[in-house]
């Protein structure tokens, strides 16, 4: 969305869309184009503000920040992935989109998670993959190339509250645009600790090859369709380790 666009124009445009659709209640998605930005820096700003958050960055593809939950459900058993797919299809079927500009508008995202705990794995002989949770984020910031979009998903049960949602997404837009003035400046006192951690991580990555090959083999066998490999590492430090400084270095 052009930076010179005013809230009055945005409010008028989407309110007209809302009235023309005769919408009363249900799942809405409101999208607003924002200036291109550094997602890691932005995630640091929002990180402690929400109980649930997720961050994913790909250099040449779609990257996102997800905050808070609009809809979520947990699935277990052998057909948990099929259950999650059905949940996703249901969500996308229900979403009613509202947007100011449609050019390059990305789709909403439902994110899948599994949590691995040592005790659970030891007691889970017949099911090496724990249950999964599927989440439709309430707030979603998506970056594709140089285009960035801010989305809000919300279960609207009263059409009178639609304008409140428009005010809310505009408020997030303003926070994002003005984030540099809102950041607290920090001293990079632990740069040496970060360098030490990166050296440790580079050495540890060599030991991950076996796990990666085993994961790829599961996909090739058709046991899994896609995977995100995770492995716990133990690292001792006497200083506070800033995860965002690690990501930025």
Positions of PLM-derived features:
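Signature of the chorismate-utilizing enzyme
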Residues: 1-249
